[in-house]
Amino acid sequence: MSERKVLNKYIPPDYDPSIRPPKKKKKFQGPNGGKLTVRLMTPFSMRCHTCGEYIYKGKKFNARKEKTGEKYFSIDILRFYIRCTRCAAEITFITDPKHADYAAESGASRNYEPWHEKRLQEYEENELAERNDIPEEDEMEKLEQKTLDTKRQMQISDALDELREKSARRSRVNIDDAIALLKEDAYGSIEEEESKKRKFEEEEIDREAKSLFSSQDGEIIRRLNAETTVEKELPKPIDLVSEKLATSNIPNFQPPKYAKRKMEKKKVLV
């Protein structure tokens, strides 16, 4: 009994996958050859060419739909296949986006409808009127447009040349040289910042010194030189008192004997 899930497969040792190409699976297109089946109603009344059966508007069919490959601007034109209800002959009709309608293609012809013919005629007349209303371009306008186009083209070519020059310059530049230049720029900016900081600090010191060594009137107090200045000896307080007493006319209240003794002591000391 074979394995149900086929988990293990035997591969012989002499198997070469390159000899046997992989199988190409055919895409499943369905019973209608890849055409979609849609449910629709006939958009107009028609008459079959094979049996002459009339198919009225609004009759429901299971139609096959496909793209014709043609487009009106960007709108795809579609084709629908139906069969006659009497003889089973194939009838096709396509979409008409230009007139917002449908048109019979093969197997049947559209019945005469006066409102439809009138509508088509009005549409054609309006289209012709629009074409006639468009003024013919003047020769001067053509020349101006041509000059503008040439100017625009020159600007585009200049921009392209600049881009080419930039790319060539970049290709010529060595990576090491670019790194060295970047480093130099970085070091130069750092040195500039340091010099600015030093200058700012010096200005701050000068401001503080001016604020400290200036008087209330705003005059600057200058520092005396140590070599030119001479320190003066301060007089003793006893000498000051004696000088004051000598200059003043204060009477001497000492007794005569004490005064004589004092004078004698001074003479002895001298």
From Swiss-Prot:
Q: Where is this region: Disordered?
A: 1-32, 251-270
Q: Mind listing the GO biological process terms from this record?
A: generation of catalytic spliceosome for first transesterification step; mRNA cis splicing, via spliceosome; RNA splicing
Molecular-function GO terms, alphabetical: metal ion binding
Superkingdom, natural source:
Eukaryota
Entry annotated with the keyword Acetylation:
no
Keywords for this entry? Metal-binding, mRNA processing, mRNA splicing, Nucleus, Spliceosome, Zinc
Q: What is its main location?
A: nucleus
Q: Where is the composition biased (Basic residues)?
A: 258-270
Positions of Zn(2+) binding = C48, C51, C84, C87
Can you list the GO cellular component terms from the UniProt entry?
A: nucleus; Prp19 complex; spliceosomal complex; U2-type catalytic step 1 spliceosome; U2-type spliceosomal complex
- Tell me which Pfam families the record gives: Saf4_Yju2 (PF04502)
Determine if Membrane is one of this entry's keywords: no
Q: Where in the cell is it found?
A: Nucleus
Query: Tell me, how does this one assemble?
Result: Component of the spliceosome. Present in the activated B complex, the catalytically activated B* complex which catalyzes the branching, the catalytic step 1 C complex catalyzing the exon ligation, and the postcatalytic P complex containing the ligated exons (mRNA) and the excised lariat intron.
Role according to the record? Part of the spliceosome which catalyzes two sequential transesterification reactions, first the excision of the non-coding intron from pre-mRNA and then the ligation of the coding exons to form the mature mRNA. Plays a role in stabilizing the structure of the spliceosome catalytic core and docking of the branch helix into the active site, producing 5'-exon and lariat intron-3'-intermediates.
Q: Which family does it belong to?
A: Belongs to the CWC16 family. YJU2 subfamily.
In its UniProt entry, what is this protein called? Splicing factor YJU2
Which organism was this protein described from? Schizosaccharomyces pombe (strain 972 / ATCC 24843)
Q: Which gene encodes it?
A: cwf16
